[in-house]
C-alpha cells in the first residue's frame, strides 16, 4: 500500500544554501521531518546550479515522517532580471522601461523554463517569457 501523504510544503530555497534556519526549519519541523536530511539532499542536487539562485521546491511529507521533494526551474522573473542585468523591474512597467533583452535571451530562458511551462511549443514559450519581461518594464528586441 502507498504511504499516506500528510501534506505538501512549497518553498523557494537558494541553490546550494539550504540550512535549518527559517523558512526551511519551521516548515519541515511542523511536520516532524528531518530538516538536516532535506538540507543535505537539496544541496547535493543543486551542486551544478549557480549558487544562490532561488529554486522552487515542493516537498511531499508522509505520515511515517519520510519525505520526497521535486525541484522546479528558477522563476522566470529572476532569469529575466539576470539577462537584462537589473536588480528589479519597473514600478511603472508600461511607461518606464528599465532594460532590454533580445529574442535570443528570451529563447534561452524559455529553454531553461520549458519543463515547467504549459506552452504548446517553443514559440509559445518564448512569447510567454517576452510577456513576463514586458510586464516588468523590460523591452524585448526582435519580437
UniProtKB/Swiss-Prot annotation:
<dbReference type="GO" id="GO:0006412">
    <property type="term" value="P:translation"/>
</dbReference>
<keyword id="KW-0689">Ribosomal protein</keyword>
<keyword id="KW-0699">rRNA-binding</keyword>
<keyword id="KW-0694">RNA-binding</keyword>
<dbReference type="InterPro" id="IPR006519">
    <property type="entry name" value="Ribosomal_uL11_bac-typ"/>
</dbReference>
<dbReference type="GO" id="GO:0003735">
    <property type="term" value="F:structural constituent of ribosome"/>
</dbReference>
<comment type="subunit">
    <text>Part of the ribosomal stalk of the 50S ribosomal subunit. Interacts with L10 and the large rRNA to form the base of the stalk. L10 forms an elongated spine to which L12 dimers bind in a sequential fashion forming a multimeric L10(L12)X complex.</text>
</comment>
<dbReference type="Pfam" id="PF00298">
    <property type="entry name" value="Ribosomal_L11"/>
</dbReference>
<dbReference type="InterPro" id="IPR020784">
    <property type="entry name" value="Ribosomal_uL11_N"/>
</dbReference>
<dbReference type="Pfam" id="PF03946">
    <property type="entry name" value="Ribosomal_L11_N"/>
</dbReference>
<comment type="function">
    <text>Forms part of the ribosomal stalk which helps the ribosome interact with GTP-bound translation factors.</text>
</comment>
<dbReference type="InterPro" id="IPR036769">
    <property type="entry name" value="Ribosomal_uL11_C_sf"/>
</dbReference>
<keyword id="KW-0488">Methylation</keyword>
<dbReference type="GO" id="GO:0070180">
    <property type="term" value="F:large ribosomal subunit rRNA binding"/>
</dbReference>
<dbReference type="GO" id="GO:0022625">
    <property type="term" value="C:cytosolic large ribosomal subunit"/>
</dbReference>
<keyword id="KW-0687">Ribonucleoprotein</keyword>
<dbReference type="InterPro" id="IPR036796">
    <property type="entry name" value="Ribosomal_uL11_N_sf"/>
</dbReference>
<dbReference type="InterPro" id="IPR020783">
    <property type="entry name" value="Ribosomal_uL11_C"/>
</dbReference>
<dbReference type="InterPro" id="IPR000911">
    <property type="entry name" value="Ribosomal_uL11"/>
</dbReference>
<protein>
    <recommendedName>
        <fullName>Large ribosomal subunit protein uL11</fullName>
    </recommendedName>
</protein>
<dbReference type="InterPro" id="IPR020785">
    <property type="entry name" value="Ribosomal_uL11_CS"/>
</dbReference>
<comment type="similarity">
    <text>Belongs to the universal ribosomal protein uL11 family.</text>
</comment>
Amino acid at each position: 500500500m502507498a504511504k499516506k501523504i500528510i501534506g505538501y510544503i512549497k518553498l523557494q530555497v537558494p541553490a546550494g544554501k539550504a540550512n535549518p534556519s527559517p523558512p526551511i526549519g519551521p516548515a519541515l519541523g511542523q511536520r516532524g521531518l528531518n530538516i538536516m536530511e532535506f538540507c543535505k539532499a537539496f544541496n547535493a542536487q543543486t551542486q551544478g546550479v549557480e549558487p544562490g539562485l532561488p529554486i522552487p521546491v515542493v516537498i511531499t511529507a508522509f505520515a511515517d515522517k519520510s519525505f520526497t521533494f521535486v525541484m522546479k526551474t528558477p522563476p522566470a522573473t529572476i532569469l529575466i532580471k539576470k539577462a537584462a542585468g537589473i536588480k528589479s523591474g519597473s514600478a511603472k512597467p508600461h511607461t518606464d522601461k528599465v532594460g532590454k533583452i533580445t529574442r535570443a535571451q528570451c529563447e534561452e530562458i524559455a529553454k531553461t523554463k520549458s519543463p515547467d511551462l504549459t506552452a504548446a511549443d517553443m514559440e509559445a514559450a518564448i512569447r510567454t517569457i517576452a510577456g513576463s519581461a514586458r510586464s516588468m518594464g523590460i523591452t524585448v528586441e526582435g519580437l
